[in-house]
Amino acid sequence: MMSISNKRSIFSWMVLALASTVMLASCASANKAVSVDSFSKEDLWSFNGEKKIYGVLYRPDGIKKAPLLIVSHGIGSDHRSGAPYAEALVKLGYAVYCYDFCGGGRASRSDGKTSEMSIFSEEADLAAVIDMFKNVEGIKKGKVTLLGISQGGMVSALYAGDNPKKVEKLVLVYPALCIKDDWVTKYPKITDMPEVVNSFGMQLGRAYVESLYDLDVYGRISNYKGEVQIIHGDQDHLVPISYSEKAHEAYKNSSFKVMPGAGHGFRGKVQQEAIEIIKDFLMR
């Protein structure tokens, strides 16, 4: 028969365990960073109209309602480019979703042709993904944090500017805010552009360019007044750092970190440094 002292010990242990669980859930629900030792991965599909969107959800173990962070990849890439960020940030207690834009890359598992893709079709993909999470169990309802890489940074910035009340925080990693200037300079009129051009190892159509002419990039993205973290290499020859400098000036509440010697595309030590910057930003 169990002694009274043993019963009290077990009861005390149960109370402590319950308190720890409540504290962990409370921290996650408040969008505060917590330390998570393990996580799971699962395939998760959504729809933009009739087009299927593929992605991978990283879930932190032990958190009942995890705040959502969505990673958007660059042109020609796919969800795998977000994996290093997801594997680090899920350990802060975030549910992290990396997905493939429709027509966004050669290895995309989502529907759609690259010749039909534009930054605005990708913004619609992002909106569809965010809407899908309203019905996913284990995800904290409300605002979402966005992390965009290169063209995914442009798309994330546009979405945040168009939907400022839906975004908790915004992280832009060498965001391709040069897209309008690059393409409109090359094709001053849409009729100057062939029906299809080869770029980034894929075929892009007029849909990619025709909606850029009237776009006020900085006027639109600066509608977002929340916290922004911008990270850019000073040796980026694909997207000059001046575009991020201008974004830093346009945003009301941004932090800007220059990565000395880094080009377009972070790897190894530089990528790890960028991840630490992002972690610090999310934890504050």
What are the roles of these predicted feature ranges?
Residues N31-G62:
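N-terminal cap/lid segment of alpha/beta-hydrolase-fold proteins
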Residues Y224, I230-H232, D236:
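Short beta-strand/loop motif that positions the catalytic acidic residue
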Residues S81, E116-V136:
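Alpha/beta-hydrolase active-site loop
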